[in-house]
Amino acid sequence: MSHCGKKTTFDAIRYSDAPPCFTHTMCEALYPGHPRAKTDEQLEHIARNGGMIGITALGYFVGSDPGGKTNIETYLDHIDHAVRLVGVDHVGLSSDFQVQGIRPWATKENWYEPRLKSFKPSYNVKWPPWIPELDSTDRFLNVTYGLFKRGYSDSAIRKILGLNWMRYFEQIIGL
């Protein structure tokens, strides 16, 4: 449902027998006008139905200036907003790209230019697309440290880093 519009999202939540999920999204309250951002009302409906919200780490999805003013703090602001809104049990990490990051393989020619042609201008695709602190395997350590600095407990950090996703998948597929 991360790619769905508002009506489809609410219909899917209403008619789903299983807890719904945004696998990779961000908070419209912090990045208004981005077509992939979800409203507080959508996030609340997901949580109310036992679902999960994965906050994406793709730079131009969480802020307007990836590689510049959009940084790890911007990303953590989205996590904070979602946690304050729906509770820590419904929020997790999401990258929307592979573990080694984008920088090791992406070039303007093979990554940026195709997206400029295929994505709507409202997606605000920028080069470079990554947030430096989130574009390597160290991203999980950087997020952990950032959440710790913001006062999150060890238990809350573990949930956000993966325990919430494990619980969700156990619930959905019965692991």
Residue ranges and their predicted role:
Residues 125-175:
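Mid-to-C-terminal alpha-helical segments outside catalytic/metal-binding sites
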Residues 67-68, 102-108, 169-175:
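Short glycine/threonine-rich loop-to-helix capping motif typified by GTGT followed
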Residues 86-111, 115-119, 123-133:
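Short acidic/histidine-rich active-site segments
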Residues 25-39, 53, 67-69:
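Glycine-rich tight-turn/loop motif centered on a GG-T
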Residues 1-21, 34-51, 73-89:
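Histidine/acidic residue-rich metal-binding segments in metalloenzymes
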Residues 4-7, 25-28, 58-60, 96-100:
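Active-site beta-loop-alpha junctions enriched in small/polar residues
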Residues 47-72:
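A conserved active-site cap/scaffold subdomain adjacent to cofactor or substrate pockets
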Residues 24, 53, 96, 157:
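Conserved, mostly hydrophobic/aromatic
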